[in-house]
């Protein structure tokens, strides 16, 4: 009777073992694996940003943290090499040989699988550590655990801070940023890798060496047209003048006329406590009324339409004109009398410029505005840097067009342009922009690919 019961009991246990191993085994193995194995993202090294003279504007510095898994090392290896490992560590890191010996022995006795050895060390030192006793056997046999950290550094500090910009990832995984960092983000980012880690004691994770791990692909380098020496001069002088006149904000752009390349951009905005820093890139992102700087566009439009020639005489009307009760005045009291169109532009006469346009385009304002459109004044530069607003050039077909629109436009009011849009036009619409897709890739002095 007892033997029958034991037999039935044994059969039941055997069936249960068979069922767990072959029927539900895969499920439980998967549960165990999910708890002990995990995929981690290995960040790629972001590409550098260089000035045209080869100076670093933005770079990623890589630092390493080193840990030791004391349990994974065999007894023979540990006992025979622990003393020499302590000597090597004392020669290259702080602390004496005795400290390292006692520190590692204690970790071994307590089964510590994630013992801190060094933090924020360079790659050169990591390579040396890989040659040390015990550690030379790697992660599986030598207990060596290496964790890489990447930090973005800006060698110029606050200079051109907004132009160089930044890029971050939001909680939804979208890239957000400003300046060159964001404009060239797709090239600078590279491609992240993947690393499988096994969970060990104390909630720590250790790299599992297998074929699933993928090394990250580092980002490309970008060479800009900025010149660090010129940038430094523009930065200092603009800050000095901004502080002198207690301006709310300011911007300065230095362009190489022959090529259209931007050699320096500097911006300052005032904080509530009266200090200045690069709050925004006003040269790209802020559109304002250009005032007298628009007179070049006005004069070109009139010359292109052949409604004026440079020697035609214009009466500046004692420096004052009236439009529906609103006055247009010259900066010189009494005006400039009768002068030719060339001198109107040279002397920047408001009344003279307004008379040229209102006399020539009376009843046909659309012709003047269409000429401006034909010249591309209403088109953005589209540098690829986010934040550039579209120019605002009113058109007679729009509802807000009125009797003041034409005279006010002629000397730069009632319209909106950014400083860089104005500068581009003044340089014959020649503005150098980099298109990585068209220019292809080159090689810099360090051997890394650049845009």
Language-model segments: which ranges?
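Hydrophobic alpha-helical transmembrane signal-anchor segments
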Residues: 1-27
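Short, basic/aromatic recognition patches
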Residues: 30-41, 235-243
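Short, small/polar residue-rich loop motifs at catalytic or cofactor-binding pockets
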Residues: 41-45, 246-249
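Juxtamembrane extramembrane loops of integral membrane proteins
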Residues: 45-88
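Beta-lactam-recognizing serine transpeptidase/beta-lactamase-like catalytic domain environment
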Residues: 56-58, 64, 200-211, 250-291, ...
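Small/polar-residue-rich segments within soluble enzyme cores
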Residues: 84-91, 105-218
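Conserved, well-ordered alpha-helix/loop/beta-strand core segments that scaffold catalytic motifs
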Residues: 207-250
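Single conserved hydrophobic/aromatic residue that forms the stacking wall/gate
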Residues: 432-451
């Amino acid at each position: 009777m007892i033997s029958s019961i034991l037999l039935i009991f044994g059969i039941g246990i055997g069936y249960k073992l068979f069922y767990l191993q072959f029927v539900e085994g895969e499920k439980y193995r998967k549960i165990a694996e999910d708890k002990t194995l995990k995929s981690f993202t290995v960040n790629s090294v972001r590409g550098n940003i260089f000035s045209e003279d080869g100076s670093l504007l933005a770079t990623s510095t890589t630092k390493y943290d080193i840990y030791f898994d004391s349990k994974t090392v065999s007894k023979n290896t540990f006992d025979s090499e622990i003393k020499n490992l302590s000597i090597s560590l004392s020669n290259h890191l702080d602390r004496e040989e005795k400290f390292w010996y006692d520190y590692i022995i204690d970790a071994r006795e307590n089964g510590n699988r994630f013992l801190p050895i060094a933090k924020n060390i360079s790659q050169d030192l990591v390579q040396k550590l890989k040659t040390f006793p015990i550690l030379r056997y790697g992660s599986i046999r030598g207990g060596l655990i290496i964790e890489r950290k990447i930090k973005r550094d800006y060698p110029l500090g606050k200079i051109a801070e907004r132009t160089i910009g930044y890029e971050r990832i939001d909680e939804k995984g979208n890239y957000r940023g400003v300046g060159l960092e964001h404009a060239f983000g797709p090239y600078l980012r590279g491609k992240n890798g993947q690393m499988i880690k096994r969970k060990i004691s104390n909630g720590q994770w250790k790299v599992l060496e297998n074929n699933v791990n993928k090394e990250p692909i580092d980002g490309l380098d970008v060479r800009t047209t900025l010149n660090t020496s010129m940038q430094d001069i523009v930065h200092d002088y603009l800050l000095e003048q901004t502080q002198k006149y207690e301006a709310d904000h300011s911007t300065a752009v230095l362009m190489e006329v022959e090529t259209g390349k931007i050699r320096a951009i500097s911006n300052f905005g005032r904080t509530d406590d009266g200090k200045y820093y690069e709050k925004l890139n006003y040269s790209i992102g802020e559109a304002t009324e250009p005032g007298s700087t628009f007179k070049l566009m006005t004069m070109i439009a009139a010359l292109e339409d052949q409604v004026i020639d440079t020697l035609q005489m214009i009466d500046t009307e004692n420096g004052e004109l009236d439009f529906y009760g609103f006055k247009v005045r010259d900066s010189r009291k009494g005006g400039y009398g009768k002068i030719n169109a060339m001198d109107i532009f040279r002397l920047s006469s408001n009344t003279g410029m307004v008379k040229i346009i209102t006399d020539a385009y009376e009843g046909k304002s659309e012709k003047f505005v269409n000429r401006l459109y034909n010249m591309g004044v209403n088109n953005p530069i589209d540098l690829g840097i986010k934040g550039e607003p579209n120019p605002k050039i009113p058109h007679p077909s729009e509802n807000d067009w009125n009797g003041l629109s034409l005279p006010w436009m002629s000397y730069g009011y009632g319209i909106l342009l950014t400083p860089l849009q104005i500068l581009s036009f003044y340089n014959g619409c020649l503005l150098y922009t980099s298109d990585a897709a068209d220019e292809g890739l080159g090689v810099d002095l360090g051997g890394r690919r650049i845009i």
